[in-house]
Amino acid sequence: MRSKIIALLLLLSCMLNVNAQDDNVRTKSVYVEVLGPSNGIGLTYDARFNENSRWGYRVGFGFGYKRTSDIFGKTSVRGYSVPVGVNYLVGGKKHALELGAGLNAGIYNNHDFTFEPWYIETTPGNKKQIGWKTKPIKENKFGMFAYTTVGYRYTSKKGFQFRAGVTPAVAFAFKGIHDHKVVLAPYISFGKAF
């Protein structure tokens, strides 16, 4: 009888322990994000405002790189940015619709070129333009875009987190860097919730 009571208590203890783990609310996470608000690849910290809140915030660091080439030369842009935002989760603890909005501000190292006249000296002191040549330009510029996110968020019982969705964004303060004013970019992320 005594062994049955001990076995019953151990079983009850295990069930309570498992139940307590299921009720564990994971309000914080760290994830690696590709595209979307990170503007390339980024590392982000995300948290709920409190344990029972569906509202949360995110802050991270992003890096983006773009390179193009044509018959005139090569251009590249490296971006180092900080995406910050708020989000709201609709659904359960495991599967949720994530709706968010925020700003991404950063410094963009722009390597570009411009055209300048190409002259030859015809006689001493006289020049004649015979064409155009490219001149490299290197400059750092400030850039910013406002974004929203609409996506799916999966958080397992053990803390694995997967996110995927789309980021509509409006670029401003990107003079000479970004050719598009409105961008629609997908995103995907993998991380750990705790």
Identify the meaning behind each predicted range.
Residues M1-K4, Q21:
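Positively charged n-region of N-terminal signal peptides that target proteins for export
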Residues K4-C14:
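Sec-dependent N-terminal signal peptides
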Residues L16-A20:
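Sec/Tat signal peptide C-region and signal peptidase I cleavage site
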Residues D23-V25, V34-S38, G73-G79, E139-F145, ...:
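Transmembrane beta-barrel outer-membrane domains
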Residues N24-S38, R54-R67, A164-F174:
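Transmembrane beta-strand segments that form the barrel wall of outer-membrane beta-barrel proteins
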Residues G40-D46:
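N-terminal secretory signal peptides
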Residues D46-F160:
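Gram-negative (and chloroplast) outer-membrane scaffold detector with strong preference
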Residues V182-F194:
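Outer-membrane beta-barrel "beta-signal"
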